[in-house]
Amino acid sequence: MEKLIIAVDGTSSSGKSVIFKKVARILNYQFVDTGLMYRAFTWYCLSKNIDINNQNQIIKLLDSFDYKISNDQVFVNNTNVTNKLTSSEILNAINKITIIPQIRNYMVKAQQQMVKNKGYILVGRDITSVVLPNADLKIYLDCDIEIRAKRRFEQNVENKILDKSFKQIYQDLIKRDQVDKTRKIGPLVLVSDAWYIDNSYLTIDQVVDIVVNKVHQLESQK
């Protein structure tokens, strides 16, 4: 059976990464969190000690930037940077980089090139609408915002991250949704041919099962 190209968009903290990493393992597909590509490039820019406000210097670094993903590990120019991509330094700098059209175009083309051999699941905010509009399967994952905030808060407590209250997380998600859905370049949208999944009252494994079954069904029709 021929494998598929699967595009996934969805709201922040709706479980996209944890769910579709599991789906990818079961199906023996390659999982790509496209947001990590932007984080990896941001790390690369910071590692070169350039002026992060100088767009020309940032754009020039694209010529020497090499990104690879293997077994959930992220490599930049053969350096494993997986554990360096969640630093506050990167999170503070990334918005100055993602707004640059040339960076955006580079990433979209790289992501499109990546899936030419099929057997890929790409997750992001505008994958179904911009990056892979012709994907074999498009999915929009959503969840009630209060439930998203509750899950994130409980996850933080479990990991002993106590810097934000439930209310703060809830307010952050409201702002994040607004930013994602109204950004000028690549806003989060529900495209007409996407399969809408609301996982507010489903477990991770329940969503994984229905997606895997759907993929098997589509593969058998190829």
Curated annotation (Swiss-Prot):
Q: Where in the cell is it found?
A: Cytoplasm
Q: Name one GO cellular component term.
A: cytoplasm
Name the enzyme group at the top EC level.
Answer: transferase
Superkingdom, taxonomy of origin? Bacteria
EC number from the UniProt entry = 2.7.4.25
Q: Which reaction does it catalyse?
A: CMP + ATP = CDP + ADP; dCMP + ATP = dCDP + ADP
Subcellular location, principal: cytoplasm
Q: Can you tell me which residues bind ATP?
A: G10, T11, S12, S13, S14, G15, K16, S17, V18
Task: Cite a single GO BP annotation.
Answer: pyrimidine nucleotide metabolic process
Keywords carried by this UniProt record: ATP-binding, Cytoplasm, Kinase, Nucleotide-binding, Transferase
Q: Name one GO molecular function term.
A: ATP binding
Pfam families named in the record: Cytidylate_kin
Report the InterPro entries cross-referenced here.
Cytidylate_kin, Cytidylate_kinase_dom, P-loop_NTPase
State the similarity comment.
Answer: Belongs to the cytidylate kinase family. Type 1 subfamily.
Q: What is this protein called?
A: Cytidylate kinase
Lineage, top ranks? Bacteria, Bacillati, Mycoplasmatota, Mollicutes, Mycoplasmataceae
The gene that this protein is the product of is: cmk
